Amino acid sequence: MAEEEEVEEGRSSSSAILDLPEPLLLHILSFLTDVRSRHRAALACGRMRAAERATRSELSLRGDPRSPGFLFLSHAFRFPALEHLDLSLVSPWGHPLLSSVPPCGGGGGGAPSASSSSGMNVYHPEAISEQNAFIAARLAGCFPAVTSLAVYCRDPTTLANLTPHWQASLRRVKLVRWHQRPPTLPDGADLEPLLETCAALRELDLSEFYCWTEDVVRALTTHPSATAALTHLDLGLAAATDGFKSSELGPIAASCPNLRKLVAPCLFNPRFSDCVGDDALLSLATSCPRLTVLRLSEPFEAAANIQREEAAITVAGLVAFFAALPALEDFTMDLQHNVLEAAPAMEALARRCPRIKFLTLGSFQGLCKASWLHLDGVAVCGGLESLYMKNCQDLTDASLAAIGRGCRRLAKFGIHGCDLVTSAGIRRLAFTLRPTLKEVTVLHCRLLHTAECLTALSPIRDRIESLEINCVWNTTEQPCSVANGTTTECDPEDDELGEVYESAAKKCRYMEFDDLGSWEMLRSLSLWFSAGQLLSPLISAGLDSCPVLEEISIKVEGDCRTCPRPAPRTIFGLSDLAGFPVLAKMKLDLSEAVGYALTAPTGQMDLSLWERFYLHGIESLQTLYELDYWPPQDKDVHHRSLTLPAVGLIQRCVGLRKLFIHGTTHEHFMTFFLSIPNLRDMQLREDYYPAPENDLMFTEMRAESWLRFEVQLNSRQIDD
């Protein structure tokens, strides 16, 4: 009887919302944006499930849409209002969604799609073609109103089958490919099906799509009617090492006269005769006068090869360039070569582009000299809300003071590689911009150690929401115990600044008396470490109280082979992050930490021991909900795989619900993760270039192995 009474009470409590008219119920449900909240509502009853499907506007598929479980769903499985569909993360990740390549060749990837969709191997090209058409039609039937599509494309077959079903509505497309471009593919063939079919296309995103610059130029110039309608074009090109030349940038701009957003890597190296210079920039501005967002960057060059020569861009050329773009709001020019005496160009930017709000500059010298009381250079851009300056060697504390006086609306500020800036300049800027500044980035500035930087940010400690810094510990200011990976209180007798503090409350010398408050609004924290450095000193350096910190990103770079072997019982220090009470998301990126994947020489540690060093203590993060992990690599053998110590440590994170490994691993290692009680969403992503081409040769994890693990994962009973 008691159970029946509880059921009746539950029905009466839910009847209030279920008795609402259908339009009002749909309107209420449309306000639920959190995915899990919508899922909970959909599980309540059939009417709520139908309402959730009717109002869902975006969806990212993680499973295998080629499997019988999806292909033979009831026709009631339909999302009539869904506009954004992401197919770039379908399982197994990186394998062709639709492919005409027989699975028996060395191209890899065909076997999983054929076997997973029909339960038997289909080798005949006609059978594969029919299968592709059926899968594409099933997707179009489930999601009839798609206007924005993201998809992983190993070859043009996927687009050739999908785009005809949404050709009238498709306005935005993002292509993803981290594998090598098929060498026999004609130039521009990857984009051919898209530009030929989708007349309504307005936005094209290739920021994570590896291809050649020749492909882009050929595709855009041979379809003038389609490209003339484009308003947003992102040509970031995943892992691009070469940018667009002057002879390529001009035709692209001429083919897309209505662009409002353009992102492109360019060749600015003056040693090349076809580099982008003043004439190319002016031609770009003349061809696309409506640009509001323009982001041009020079692909990263190795330090051994780079020489800080002058770029082929002059101040006079920039002045003419800005004069031709009056609507510009967001401008990025991140160069590896110097532009000298850039202050007049920045003043022209403020004068000619009055709407400018977001500005990112790399290797621009003389941005703000601040030699007199009047403002000069970038400081006259009073409408800026975001400013990021990189490798500006003559930027000083006085420059920051002038920027603080002139740019009073700044909410985001960042410097990278500015070696003359000190903590005094950062503190003065923070004090001046206290009412507006919310996000700060300080990276690789020679005179700014981490503790000094945190101290300098004390004026906005209670207001800042996002912080990105590189961790450089001043060993002369650390106790020996901190340098060895442990933390203890400082000895008051060792503090040379005793006259500043009260003797009963002395702190470490990098802690100021007015820095005892908490980081009340800090929600996102990004940390950069060189290989072998410790996280442990971070807490005692000033980041001890972050009550609302939700997300942390840790990036480690360097050659572990040159690092001394850590002392016994010395660990990186992830357990220190357990003091953040609501930490839910972590990105731990060791992809640029290089070591020995196989047997290491005497006295050195292989990658498995380095993974143990960095991951030890991660089980202490009881609130951790989502983890993205990039394993370290051995570039000599192109090895980026999860080792047994890493698997054993990660599987002890009992609170994890989402786990994404950006690398490979062995199938029997995956069974460890089944012991994580609430793990619901997991994926192996080889989203780095070049991703392994052939599962049978270069990766430990086969597609069939992953699908078997996925069945085990999805068959578990999740408590919540």
From Swiss-Prot:
Report the gene knockout effect: Increased number of tillers and reduced plant height.
Cystine connections? none
CDD domains, per database record? F-box_D3-like
Q: Which tissues and organs express this gene's product?
A: Expressed in leaves. Expressed in roots, culms, leaf blades, leaf sheaths, shoot bases and panicles.
Gene Ontology BP term (one): shoot system morphogenesis
| Residues in LRR repeats | 71-134, 135-158, 159-189, 190-218, 219-247, 248-279, 280-316, 317-344, 345-372, 373-398, 399-435, 436-452, 453-510, 511-537, 538-571, 572-606, 607-644, 645-720
The signal peptide here is: none
Q: Does the keyword ATP-binding apply?
A: no
Judging by the UniProt lineage, the source's domain of life is Eukaryota
Q: Which residues form the F-box domain?
A: 14-60
Locations listed in the record = Nucleus
A GO CC annotation given for this chain:
nucleus
Show the InterPro entries listed in the entry.
Answer: F-box-like_dom_sf (IPR036047), F-box_dom (IPR001810), Leu-rich_rpt_Cys-con_subtyp (IPR006553), LRR_dom_sf (IPR032675)
Keyword list (alphabetical) reads: Leucine-rich repeat, Nucleus, Repeat, Ubl conjugation pathway
Query: What's one Pfam family the UniProt record gives for this protein?
Result: F-box-like
Q: How does it assemble?
A: Associates to a SCF (SKP1-CUL1-F-box protein) E3 ubiquitin-protein ligase complex. Interacts with D14 in a strigolactone-dependent manner. Interacts with SKP1, SKP5 and SKP20.
Q: What does this protein do?
A: Involved in strigolactone (SL) signaling. Required for responses to SLs and the establishment of arbuscular mycorrhiza symbiosis in rice. Strigolactone-dependent association of D3 with D14 and D53 (a repressor of SL signaling) triggers D53 ubiquitination and degradation. Controls tillering by suppressing axillary bud activity. Tiller is a specialized grain-bearing branch that is formed on the unelongated basal internode and grows independently of the mother stem (culm) by means of its own adventitious roots.
Q: What is this protein called?
A: F-box/LRR-repeat MAX2 homolog
Q: Which organism is it from?
A: Oryza sativa subsp. japonica
